[in-house]
């Protein structure tokens, strides 16, 4: 009799234990997947991003904006609503954190603020949270069903931000790519980030920059026929002067996974100033030699080009460049409109 009761007792205890485990696993599982009677959810991936809404200031050395991509399956036959206004939360222990509203479609950032999921359908949704590096959180998903009296259970997903440190460290790569691009192609410098981060037709862009300079100098020398070897020397001097005097201050103002927007504050050597200096030397030559031969006068002025570049200071641009980039095969491509701006600023020397 005692043995029989013991078996019954053990069976009852086991049943209660299994029931408890079943209830727990229905709302929370180890890892980044979880389910309830209404939904099944999985964190597919996540990455740190930068939003333009705060002009790129959402990131410091320890915190950042994390884009979390979640795959949600509606297990019911009816549509459900899972939106970031009241159905999605981030938990830091007892602290509840609301998701951020982000709308930067130019770089692929767009939260799913009103997500309807049809019956038996699967939807990939994105949510944005301000988080700390190397910290564990939980994402809570609580959908609304058509039956207002039947409140859905909140599903909890574990989120370990340490897994996404690589994306945090790469947030400023677009700015590094812009700086390496300009220094390599327009200043003639070697930048370690060029081969690592930049995708560009180097020969084509360098040729375009040189052509812009040559056209500008042809005007500045009043049509004087400057031979190719002399023009090449002038261009080399100009690039060396840019490398010495020009300043570049790029910053990422918005960045998604594979798109970015960079603002470039810069200074450059104005070829308008060089134009004026060449004219002054030509005028000086004509006055000293009592001649009106402008071609000969400008041939003399060209011989002073190195000194002119030495004496000419860089000037700050009155506006910041806006540069759009795309990530392709692990490297950043710069939009063609920005290349035109670079040619104007660092080829033609127009500020």
Describe these PLM feature segments.
Residues 22-25:
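Bacterial signal peptide processing site
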Residues 164-240, 246-248, 273:
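Core segments of small alpha/beta cavity-forming domains
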Residues 73-123, 287, 291-294:
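The feature marks short-to-medium sequence segments in extracytoplasmic or secretory-pathway proteins
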Residues 130-156, 337:
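Short, surface-exposed ligand- or partner-binding patches at beta-edge/loop junctions that are enriched
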Residues 100-138, 304-319:
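Short, solvent-exposed, Trp/other aromatic-anchored flexible loops in extracytoplasmic proteins
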Residues 271-317:
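Mixed-charge, low-complexity intrinsically disordered segments
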Residues 96-100, 150-152, 318-350:
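Short beta-strand edge/turn micro-motifs at domain boundaries
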Residues 16-20:
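C-terminal motif of bacterial Sec signal peptides marking the signal peptidase cleavage site
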């Amino acid at each position: 009799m005692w043995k029989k009761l013991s078996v019954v007792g053990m069976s009852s205890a086991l049943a209660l234990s299994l029931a408890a485990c079943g209830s727990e696993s229905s709302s929370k599982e180890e890892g980044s997947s979880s389910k309830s009677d209404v939904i099944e959810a999985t964190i597919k991936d996540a990455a740190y991003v930068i939003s333009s809404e705060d002009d790129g200031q959402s990131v410091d050395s320890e915190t950042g904006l994390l884009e979390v991509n979640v795959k949600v399956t509606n297990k019911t036959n009816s549509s459900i609503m899972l939106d970031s206004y009241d159905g999605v939360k981030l938990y830091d222990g007892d602290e509840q954190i609301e998701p951020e509203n982000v709308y930067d479609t130019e770089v692929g950032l767009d939260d799913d603020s009103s997500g309807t999921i049809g019956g038996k359908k699967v939807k990939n949704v994105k949510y944005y949270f301000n988080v700390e590096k190397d910290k564990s959180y939980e994402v809570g998903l609580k959908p609304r069903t058509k039956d207002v009296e039947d409140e859905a259970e909140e599903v909890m997903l574990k989120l370990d931000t340490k897994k996404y440190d690589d994306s945090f460290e790469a947030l400023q790569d677009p700015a590094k790519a812009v700086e390496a691009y300009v220094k390599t192609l327009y200043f003639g410098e070697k930048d370690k980030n060029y081969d690592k981060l930049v995708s560009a037709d180097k020969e084509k862009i360098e040729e375009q920059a040189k052509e812009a300079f040559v056209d500008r100098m042809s005007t500045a020398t009043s049509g004087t026929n400057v031979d190719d070897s002399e023009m090449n020397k002038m261009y080399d001097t100009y690039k060396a002067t840019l490398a010495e005097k020009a300043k570049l201050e790029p910053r990422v103002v918005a960045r998604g996974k594979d798109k970015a927007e960079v603002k470039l504050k810069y200074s450059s050597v104005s070829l308008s100033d060089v134009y004026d200096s060449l004219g002054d030397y030509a005028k000086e030559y004509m006055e000293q030699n009592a001649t009106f031969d402008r071609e000969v006068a400008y041939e003399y002025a060209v011989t002073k080009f190195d000194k002119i570049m030495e004496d000419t200071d860089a000037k700050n641009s009155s506006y910041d460049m806006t540069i759009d980039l795309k990530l392709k095969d692990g490297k950043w491509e710069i939009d063609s409109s920005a290349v035109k701006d670079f040619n104007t600023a660092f080829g033609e020397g127009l500020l």
